[in-house]
Amino acid sequence: MVCKRWILYGRVQGVGLRHFLRVHGVRLQLEGYVRNLPDGSVEVVAQGEKEKVLKLKTIILQGNGFSRLEDVQEEDFPIGNYGSFHIEY
């Protein structure tokens, strides 16, 4: 099991990205969350089987057709009890 945290920069708020990533996170049976940050970026924390977390990373990089990534920061993150993949407000 692995846990990753990504901070997404660019046109990432107000374009349906959180909902898009939640749907994929649930389908991949991941735990974690996605949320908007005050600086206009989006934070994603995903925990699960390594292959499934890497698949979510691929989905993040592809975007939803409305988002436009300018930068992505990635780091290992502590394993936690995040529950099902959800949107945090």
Curated annotation (Swiss-Prot):
> Which intervals of the chain form a coiled coil?
none
Its keywords, alphabetically, are: Hydrolase
Keyword Hydrolase among record annotations = yes
**PROSITE patterns linked:** ACYLPHOSPHATASE_2, ACYLPHOSPHATASE_3
* Gene Ontology molecular functions: acylphosphatase activity
The active-site annotation reads 18, 36
Annotated Acylphosphatase-like domain residues: 3-89
* Taxonomy, superkingdom: Bacteria
| Record family assignment | Belongs to the acylphosphatase family.
Instruction: Give the protein name, as stated in the record.
Output: Acylphosphatase
This protein's species is: Petrotoga mobilis (strain DSM 10674 / SJ95)
Q: Highest lineage ranks of the organism?
A: Bacteria, Thermotogati, Thermotogota, Thermotogae, Petrotogales
